Design a protein with these regions (language model features):
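Conserved N-terminal helical subregion
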Residues: 10-13, 82-185, 193-198
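N-terminal Rossmann-like FAD-binding beta1-loop-alpha1 element of flavoenzymes
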Residues: 14-41
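Conserved Rossmann-like nucleotide-cofactor binding loop
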Residues: 24, 47, 179
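Glycine-rich FAD pyrophosphate-binding loop
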Residues: 33-55
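N-terminal FAD cofactor-binding segment of flavoenzymes
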Residues: 54-94
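Conserved FAD-binding catalytic core of PHBH/FMO-like flavoproteins
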Residues: 70, 156-160, 165-166, 171-279
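FAD/FMN-dependent oxidoreductases across multiple families
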Residues: 246-340
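C-terminal helical "tail/cap" subdomain of flavin- and related membrane-associated enzymes
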Residues: 325-416
Length: 416
């Protein structure tokens, strides 16, 4: 349920408090409440504002594994009608005739061919999460509400809100983004580095069908991705040198569309813009630890990576699945869900996977965002090898779906 203002109780006691009501944070809260763990989610913006058409024009790639997490949290039923499936992935180098083609029919999972994932508007994902929150009496969604301080000790944590309310819990889950209060109050340090790139984003409609094919063209200034949405719509994620981004954003619309057509190769036919153009600077963020006394970090409070592999939110939803599992297991055994032993299990499970993926994505950026001859040769050899080795190709396909490593129960489709 959603509460706002100061009409609710001035002091709330719960098992877990989630700071941040974004895609990862509210998914975390829904997963816990679905499994019977009392949870409060503190969300600084109102649902009405977040669900508005102009609040967030971004889209998100939801991998197959992430769909299973959302399904286990009872959210996917609200998202599926808005989700465009990714059936094929085509990776190409602009300066080479070689390309890699991944076909979902070449891999079986759960007894049948599955999409690699789905593309959704962020606003549709938010609306689905709000709908699920209303269905869960054990989820108190405080929105709008702003956390201003966190006090922690051996027995629990206290979160104070700007309106005077207080939330007491065994565990604080920091899902409050790159400028995380939970992370900063716990004294967890960050490793960060920036790319000389920003992502230009927009949504387009086109006259020719995309047939569920996601296309990524590697260009010297950064990758250019066309991601299939519902109907004849696609999401554009265009990584470009920061010095050139303003020029492209200010182009007259017809010239900008011409640039999209040129970069995509024209296979989409006539193009029209459905949203404004926007740009986001690209950087990497890695928390040195994902846990502290009475605190666990998920999503962009813990990590942010380059969108080259489309794994940003998927990494966060793997956090959700792992942390929800360790919390639910402890709760059902009558243990303290915020104890060092419980949190250490989450840290062991998630941090290595996250650091590895961040390093892989960083390597891909440097491998593909240039046209240096020896590196170009290495790219060509790599794509040729992948095309000729079906087991290697299936390995990369499983990574795209998110079904590798030690899988939490939610990803396996097993209820918590």
């Amino acid at each position: 349920m959603t509460e706002s203002g100061t009409t609710a109780a001035q002091e709330i006691t719960t098992e877990v408090v989630v700071l941040g009501g974004g895609l990862a944070g509210l998914s975390m809260a829904a997963a816990l409440a679905t499994a019977g763990v009392p949870v409060v989610c503190i969300d600084r913006d109102s649902p009405d504002r977040q669900a508005g058409d102009d609040f967030d024009i971004r889209t998100t790639a939801v991998a197959y594994a992430s769909m299973k997490v959302l399904e286990g949290a009872g959210v996917w039923k609200h998202m599926e009608p808005c989700a465009g499936p990714i059936l094929d992935i085509r990776v190409a180098d602009q300066f080479s005739p070689l390309f890699v083609h991944y076909d979902h029919k070449d891999l079986t999972w759960d007894g049948k061919n599955q999409p690699f994932g789905w593309i959704l508007d962020n606003k549709d994902m938010r609306r689905a999460l709000f709908a699920r929150a209303k269905e869960l009496p054990g989820l108190h969604h405080l929105a709008p509400a702003q956390a201003v301080s966190i006090e922690r000790n051996r027995s629990g944590a206290t979160v104070k809100l700007a309106d005077g309310r207080v939330v007491k819990a065994r565990l604080v889950v920091g899902a409050d983004g790159r400028r995380s209060l939970a992370r900063e109050s716990a004294g967890i340090k960050l490793r960060t580095w920036a790319y000389d790139q920003s992502a230009i984003i927009c949504t387009i409609r086109h006259s020719e069908p995309h047939n569920g094919v996601a296309v990524e063209h590697f260009l010297p200034n950064g990758p250019f991705a066309v991601l299939p949405m519902t109907e004849n719509r696609s999401s554009i994620v265009w990584s470009e040198k920061r010095s050139l981004v303003d020029m492209y954003l200010k182009l007259p619309e017809d010239q900008f569309i011409d640039e999209l057509t040129r970069r995509s190769g024209g296979y989409l036919g006539d193009i029209e813009l459905l949203t404004r153009r926007d740009a986001w600077p690209l950087s990497v963020l890695l928390a040195e630890r994902f846990i502290a006394e009475r605190v666990a970090l998920i999503g962009e409070a813990a990590h942010a990576i380059h969108p080259i592999a489309g794994q940003g939110l998927n990494l966060g939803l793997r956090d959700v699945a792992a942390l929800a599992e360790v919390i639910v297991d402890a709760h059902r055994l009558g243990l303290d869900v915020g104890s060092p032993e419980v949190l250490a299990r989450f840290q062991r499970w998630r941090r290595f996977d996250t650091v590895l993926l961040a390093a892989v994505c960083d390597g891909l950026v440097h491998l593909f965002s240039n046209n240096i001859p020896p590196i170009k040769l290495a790219r060509d050899v790599g794509m040729a090898v992948v095309n000729r080795l079906p087991p290697l190709k299936r390995f990369f396909m499983r990574h795209a779906m998110g079904v590798v490593g030690e899988l939490p129960r939610m990803i396996k489709g097993v209820p918590l």
